[in-house]
Amino acid sequence: MNTDIANLKNQCIEELSRIKSLQELEDFQVKYLGKKGILKSKLKELSKLEPAIRAQVGKELNSLREYLEESIAIQRKRFLEEEKQKRIQSERIDVTIPGKRVEIGAIHILSQVQNEIAEIFLNMGYEIAEGPEVELDYYNFEALNIPADHPARDTQDTFYISEDVLLRTHTSPVQIRVMKSKKPPIKIISPGRVYRSDEVDSTHSPIFHQIEGLFVDKGVTMADLKGTLEVFAKRFFGEQTKVRFRPHHFPFTEPSAEVDISCIFCGGKGCRTCKGEGWIEILGAGMVHRKVLLNCGIDPDIYTGFAFGMGVERIALLRYEIEDIRLFYENDLRFLKQFR
């Protein structure tokens, strides 16, 4: 029996020396020390031995079990340490490698232009006023002296949510809300998104941005309007810029005008951009209509005012010689990065 135990120990030592992984070690432990393992079977056979040798054999088997448990523990510790070192090496960070550059965002070109326009008027004493983009028909049309049969009120040009609710077609409703809630003097600009049922092409979009201005006080004249817009044009487009008013019609202003600036590309000599005329239209303006003042509870015999409005996209197109308005909305980084 002693010889069998010695042979078993030698067998275990040989198998242990060939083990190369933690999984092989676990299999070895199950084979020899498991519930159905070889050593367990040997211990069960002790009852069949003569009492004279049973104690000695049991002692040798227990000694072998302790040897195997200790050897397995040592091997397991070694394998775990090796795995730990491999993991450490695989997760090692080389602090000398340059870090990845963080891509920093920038203000969108339309926001840049809108902010610059707003800053010019803020420096002239204007305040910023805002209003809802989902608007009532009354504020968007009726209060602005736009009659029911006006083309702008057609469903083909306006996004109606219900009979009396729509997406505002201009930021003029903000002016109405301010005039109804404040007493003159009133001096505001109202930037924001507006919506019109236009087909998308290089110059049109169903969503775009406007900045409108309003000044109401005693003694405000057309000369004040012209002077204000001349200051804006020179500060935004350059001191050499000239301004021209052309008669026009808007239902909410009287008299009304379309405002041109001397072509910023040819200096008024005539080029492809200005179609040879030397002038480029930038906005509409005029004196606030008497009916609009009355609709807001302001006496037109005491107070007068002027209003103007421009498309932010149009101003940006002109300044940067961009030919397609869709570029502003497509989020193409190749385009946007040019204006950082």
From Swiss-Prot:
Binds 2 magnesium ions per tetramer. One of its GO terms (biological process) is phenylalanyl-tRNA aminoacylation. GO terms for molecular function: ATP binding; catalytic activity, acting on a protein; magnesium ion binding; phenylalanine-tRNA ligase activity; transferase activity; tRNA binding. GO terms for cellular component: cytoplasm. InterPro entries: aa-tRNA-synth_II, aa-tRNA-synth_II/BPL/LPL, Phe-tRNA-synth_IIc_asu, Phe-tRNA_ligase_II_N, Phe_tRNA_ligase_alpha1_bac, Phenylalanyl-tRNA_Synthase, tRNA-bd_arm. It catalyses: tRNA(Phe) + L-phenylalanine + ATP = L-phenylalanyl-tRNA(Phe) + AMP + diphosphate + H(+). Keywords: Aminoacyl-tRNA synthetase, ATP-binding, Cytoplasm, Ligase, Magnesium, Metal-binding, Nucleotide-binding, Protein biosynthesis. Its EC number is 6.1.1.20. The keyword Cytoplasm applies. It is found in: Cytoplasm. It comes from the Bacteria. Belongs to the class-II aminoacyl-tRNA synthetase family. Phe-tRNA synthetase alpha subunit type 1 subfamily. This is Phenylalanine--tRNA ligase alpha subunit.
